[in-house]
Amino acid sequence: RDRAFSIFYVGINLGAFFSPLICGTLGEKLGWHYGFAAAGVGMIVGLVIYIWGQKHLAPDNIMKEAAGQAKPEPLSPDDVKKIWALVVLCAFNIVFWAVYEQQGNTMALWADANTDRMILGWEMPASWFQAFNPAMIFIFTPALTWFWAWQEGRGREPSSMAKMSIGCVLLGASFLVMLPAVSSCVGGGKAGMGWLTACTFVLTIGELYLS
């Protein structure tokens, strides 16, 4: 189930990869009216696909029939422990996504103001850094899927809760990567792109473990 969801996760990140390249480039080069207009067109296309694809969804009565057959039973002590463990992990999950979403603001501002984006005399748009995360999801999801299958074959695949815990640890580690970059900017200097790329890499692996 975890591996199947990871494959699905690659699909939903397709738009996240192309949107910074298209909307960000239009916004930075031509004006943000063009960038937001392109985003609006993309949202309309997504809505059309969603409405068109509804015919492939299972009818609602399946869930209603299943709910009618369910018989509530009292929770066992083991069930209570699992629920409390889930509550704790949900709390960490909230923190994870709150910090993760810094990609769209704090890290974007860092890329714009404190990162040397010159490549052979060409300056890469700061918004393109937003495409790094989904690109890494494309690249590393198959590798992690294979790794988890390899672990499962040896009876050592972590549980879903263990994976979420690993993801939270990697989240913290990703921002530790930026400490040397911050030091290099003292006095008005700019950090190399490698630091932000490395931070995004560790953050992405953590995201895949948690998601």
Protein language model regions, located:
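Central cavity-lining transmembrane alpha-helices of secondary-active solute carriers
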Residues: F17-S19, V45, A131-W148, A173
